[in-house]
Amino acid sequence: MYQGGFIMKLDKKQRFSIRKYAVGATSVLIGFTFSAQVVSADGLTPAPKATETLQAVPDSPQASEAPIQDKEEKLVKQADKTIKEEVKTEKDTVNTVVPKTDNAVAPVVTEHASPAPTTESENTTQVEKSGESANTEKKNEPATPAVLAPTTERATQTNEKLAKKKIVSIDAGRKYFSPEQLKEIIDKAKHYGYTDLHLLVGNDGLRFMLDDMSITANGKTYASDDVKRAIEKGTNDYYNDPNGNHLTESQMTDLINYAKDKGIGLIPTVNSPGHMDAILNAMKELGIQNPNFNYFGKESARTVDLDNEQAVAFTKALIDKYAAYFAKKTEIFNIGLDEYANDATNAKGWSVLQADKYYPNEGYPVKGYEKFIAYANDLARIVKSHGLKPMAFNDGIYYNSDTSFGTFDKDIIVSMWTGGWGGYDVASSKLLVEKGHQILNTNDAWYYVLGRNADGQGWYNLDQGLNGIKNTPITSVPKSDGATIPFIGGMVAAWADTPSARYSPSRLFKLMRQFANSNAEYFAADYESAEQALNEVPKDLNRYTAESVAAVNEAAKVIRSLDSNLSRAQQDTIDQAIAKLQEAVSLSLIHI
């Protein structure tokens, strides 16, 4: 942080570094033995009113001890001016957000674009208002629109909700999870009606290794065994997990196939340019000099220096390697992009990247934010070249709602986890939709950090997550600016900020169950018990009376004729049919 006696502090407020990471939007609806109907998730869904989502304040805030310099004062004033100018455009907000066609907006990013100012504003998550888009949509309706029968309309709404992605995210980058543990999570995901497992394999640690890890970059090829040793050591330097270092390629392939058989998709994450401690350590082992971002003498342990061409080239080649493996196995690949150098900048990383525009030649990264946009778009291009959909966390995308630096690839699905906090001024979900991005709601109101199992045990504790789920529905997208935000699904997340903390399956499953129960209309009903009940009907009915056989057959027929697109909110329909079948079988045994 110190260089030549100059200390940068971008605001007067205390800065907090909130950890999250989480991610994805899926592939498959939960399968069911009976024939399923095809449903669509493309429509806009009005969001109900909900309580305001509380923004995170970590349990161990890092207060700045540095005095405020004149340069920071000017930066804050410039930010305030920007806010006042932007407020004028919010008066005529349309409640239902649709992507805009940008004709004269920011240029496609190049290495010569111009940065933008930092804003300082307190952001709290705003919750969508239900049904407010209805009046605006009616303008385009025919004079005598066709009206669906009520039952058909309800069925359509149910199918649209069931088509949304329901994802559970596991931080298997910081902490090692065994294949058996992950399969158990997949089983529970199937049982509760989820569609996908979001698996962070690269998040601070890197805990997934391919058979061939050779990397070609910087005019040379790094041998596979050398890369493996370097990454394994890099992960152990981050946290030497006694339970294991990484998953192998065969284990991952088996896991993907296991999930597919259950109707569950898998969404991998390899995070960069931040949260890549192990990769940075590995690069140094392989002879790449100074790969870490350095902020006025303070080195980030987890973030790559975007000005280090060798380090950036190696990272891109590594992402390309993993994307090639996941091609045709998964649908979405999360490239991360969150929290740039928060550890070295006191959570001011994005502001630091944008600062050079206003204070050139003062040591800030030259065109730093333009380089970040170019980097993000390069990763998106790499992922798309393998037939995958890129996804990334929201905080760095159009930071400070500034679009003058360049344009992010619209194909990047935005995992919207935060509305920001004091001095961490992220773009609204409304703006991101207008810029053409799909939104996966990853609201941090639903977060749980392993080991923080009750109130009083730190931010993102389990009680906080459970209460957040109860009070914040799946439709409540962070920082909506009063608009109804179209979203492709929701993701609940379990993080391992303290990787040594014990993993408790029962606590994770409690979180997953609460998310499903609180949003029951969006989750598929559990048909497994119905299938089991049918399988338990005696095969030989010759010993039973004709009346008993008829009763059993009729009860079984009711189960087989059940609508295969029932939601978890309609689980009683299935359970009652099962109870009647079991009762019929029991009475048959009595009458033998």
Residue ranges and their predicted role:
Residues 312-316, 320-326, 331-332, 362-526:
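Substrate-binding groove of N-acetylhexosamine-processing glycoside hydrolases
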Residues 590-592:
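Conserved small/polar residues in nucleotide/adenosyl-binding loops
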Residues 161-163, 204-260, 277-310, 341-366:
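Aromatic- and acidic-residue-enriched carbohydrate-binding clefts of CAZyme catalytic domains
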Residues 534-588:
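Amphipathic, non-membrane alpha-helical rod segments
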Residues 181-204:
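Catalytic domains of carbohydrate-active enzymes, especially glycoside hydrolases
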Residues 2-7, 40-160:
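Low-complexity, acidic Ser/Thr/Pro-rich repeat tracts that form intrinsically disordered stalk/linker regions
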Residues 19-40:
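Sec-dependent N-terminal signal peptides of Gram-positive bacterial secreted proteins and lipoproteins
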Residues 252-273, 302-334:
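An active-site-proximal structural segment forming one wall of the substrate-binding cleft
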